[in-house]
């Protein structure tokens, strides 16, 4: 009876794993090589996708920050535009003031071009000349009030009376005139030339 129950046992491979067949060495090596080749491709594709997303995000950021319809202009261009406009207004006001000042200064010739430095120097000299004219008055017959006394300095307040005219220059000890160099005033020289022309004209008319 014991002999009747014994049966031939199937091979262990077919009994436990009937659908699994062992692989050969060539197939095993081929599967390993294909797996190793697929891994770098997947990594490269992931990197490309990340870089593309970064480029798209950067492009949207740049488009939003520009002064287009979808973005707002930056603060720096607006401040620069305001500063440039303020500087242009200041330059125009200064040029207008210098142009008005040039019209008040007599020059020879009348249409003489003056720089800003020359305009300021001539304006200062003309103010000093007019001050000497007020101080000396008609006492100076040669038309050169600036040569008859010291330069004029307006030290009093507005509306205060003018000081008395200065005395004539003293004589030197050797009996000659004072050896101090005379101040040259272009406006006095211009007046002197005008006086000489008037004398010549009157002399020509009389003769």
Curated annotation (Swiss-Prot):
This is Basic helix-loop-helix transcription factor scleraxis. Pfam families: HLH. Residues 73-91 have a biased composition (Basic and acidic residues). It comes from Mus musculus. Residues 78-130 form the bHLH domain. GO terms for molecular function: bHLH transcription factor binding; cis-regulatory region sequence-specific DNA binding; DNA-binding transcription activator activity, RNA polymerase II-specific; E-box binding; protein dimerization activity; RNA polymerase II cis-regulatory region sequence-specific DNA binding; sequence-specific DNA binding. One of its GO terms (biological process) is embryonic skeletal system development. Plays an early essential role in mesoderm formation, as well as a later role in formation of somite-derived chondrogenic lineages. SUPFAM superfamilies: HLH, helix-loop-helix DNA-binding domain (SSF47459). InterPro entries: bHLH_dom, E-box_TF_Regulators, HLH_DNA-bd_sf. Expressed in mesenchymal precursors of cartilage and in connective tissue. Highly expressed in tendons in the limb, tongue and diaphragm and in cartilage of the bronchi. SMART domains: HLH. Residues 1-91, 151-183 are annotated as: Disordered. Keywords: Activator, Developmental protein, DNA-binding, Nucleus, Transcription, Transcription regulation. Residues 161-171 have a biased composition (Pro residues). The keyword Transcription applies. CDD domains: bHLH_TS_scleraxis. One of its GO terms (cellular component) is nucleus. It is found in: Nucleus. Efficient DNA binding requires dimerization with another bHLH protein. Dimerizes and binds the E-box consensus sequence with E12.
